[in-house]
Protein backbone atom coordinates (compact mmCIF):
# COMPACT_ATOMS: atom_id res chain seq x y z
CA UNK A 1 0.00 0.00 0.00
CA UNK A 2 1.21 3.49 -0.85
CA UNK A 3 0.14 6.66 0.89
CA UNK A 4 0.30 10.26 -0.27
CA UNK A 5 0.11 12.97 2.35
CA UNK A 6 0.51 16.67 1.89
CA UNK A 7 -0.75 20.20 2.24
CA UNK A 8 -2.34 22.40 -0.40
CA UNK A 9 -2.81 25.79 1.28
CA UNK A 10 -5.59 25.10 3.82
CA UNK A 11 -6.40 21.64 2.44
CA UNK A 12 -4.81 18.54 3.93
CA UNK A 13 -4.20 15.80 1.38
CA UNK A 14 -4.22 12.13 2.31
CA UNK A 15 -4.75 9.33 -0.21
CA UNK A 16 -4.12 5.61 -0.03
CA UNK A 17 -3.13 3.87 -3.25
CA UNK A 18 -2.87 0.15 -3.88
CA UNK A 19 -0.38 0.31 -6.74
CA UNK A 20 2.64 2.46 -7.55
CA UNK A 21 1.13 3.55 -10.87
CA UNK A 22 -1.96 4.92 -9.15
CA UNK A 23 0.14 6.62 -6.49
CA UNK A 24 2.24 8.32 -9.17
CA UNK A 25 -0.93 9.45 -10.96
CA UNK A 26 -2.36 11.03 -7.81
CA UNK A 27 0.99 12.62 -7.02
CA UNK A 28 1.25 14.10 -10.53
CA UNK A 29 -2.32 15.41 -10.43
CA UNK A 30 -1.50 17.34 -7.27
CA UNK A 31 1.75 18.68 -8.76
CA UNK A 32 -0.11 19.80 -11.89
CA UNK A 33 -2.68 21.51 -9.69
CA UNK A 34 0.14 23.26 -7.84
CA UNK A 35 1.63 24.47 -11.13
CA UNK A 36 -1.43 26.68 -11.60
CA UNK A 37 -0.45 28.55 -8.44
CA UNK A 38 3.32 28.70 -8.86
CA UNK A 39 4.73 30.90 -11.63
CA UNK A 40 8.26 29.53 -11.55
CA UNK A 41 7.24 25.86 -11.83
CA UNK A 42 7.00 24.44 -15.36
CA UNK A 43 5.67 21.32 -17.05
CA UNK A 44 9.27 20.23 -17.54
CA UNK A 45 9.76 20.38 -13.77
CA UNK A 46 6.66 18.22 -13.32
CA UNK A 47 7.95 15.63 -15.80
CA UNK A 48 11.31 15.51 -14.01
CA UNK A 49 9.48 15.07 -10.72
CA UNK A 50 7.37 12.22 -12.15
CA UNK A 51 10.55 10.43 -13.24
CA UNK A 52 12.07 10.88 -9.78
CA UNK A 53 8.91 9.65 -8.05
CA UNK A 54 8.54 6.60 -10.29
CA UNK A 55 12.21 5.74 -9.76
CA UNK A 56 11.67 6.00 -6.01
CA UNK A 57 8.57 3.82 -6.12
CA UNK A 58 10.14 1.07 -8.15
CA UNK A 59 13.40 1.01 -6.20
CA UNK A 60 11.62 1.41 -2.84
CA UNK A 61 13.52 4.65 -2.25
CA UNK A 62 10.63 6.05 -0.26
CA UNK A 63 9.42 8.25 1.33
CA UNK A 64 9.72 10.79 -1.43
CA UNK A 65 9.13 14.41 -0.43
CA UNK A 66 8.26 17.20 -2.83
CA UNK A 67 7.68 20.85 -1.96
CA UNK A 68 6.37 23.45 -4.39
CA UNK A 69 6.09 26.28 -1.87
CA UNK A 70 5.83 26.56 1.91
CA UNK A 71 2.06 26.09 1.56
CA UNK A 72 2.17 23.24 -0.95
CA UNK A 73 3.98 19.95 -0.37
CA UNK A 74 3.49 16.24 -0.94
CA UNK A 75 5.08 13.10 0.40
CA UNK A 76 4.77 9.62 -1.09
CA UNK A 77 5.32 6.69 1.30
CA UNK A 78 5.14 2.92 1.17
CA UNK A 79 3.31 1.40 4.12
Predicted regions mapped to residue ranges:
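Short aromatic-glycine-(Arg/Gly/Cys) micro-motifs in beta-strand/loop hairpins
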Residues: 1-12, 26-30
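Hydrophobic beta-strand residues in large extracellular and virion-surface proteins
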Residues: 2-4, 15-17, 23, 74-76
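Intrinsic-disorder/low-complexity loop/linker signature
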Residues: 8-14, 63, 71
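A short, exposed loop/beta-hairpin motif centered on an aromatic-Gly-Thr core
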Residues: 9-22, 36
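Small-residue helix-packing motif on alpha-helices
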Residues: 23-25, 46
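Short, mixed-charge low-complexity intrinsically disordered segments
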Residues: 32-79
Amino acid sequence: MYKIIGKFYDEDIERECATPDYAIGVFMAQIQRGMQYTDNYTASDAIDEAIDVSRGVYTNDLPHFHQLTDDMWLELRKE
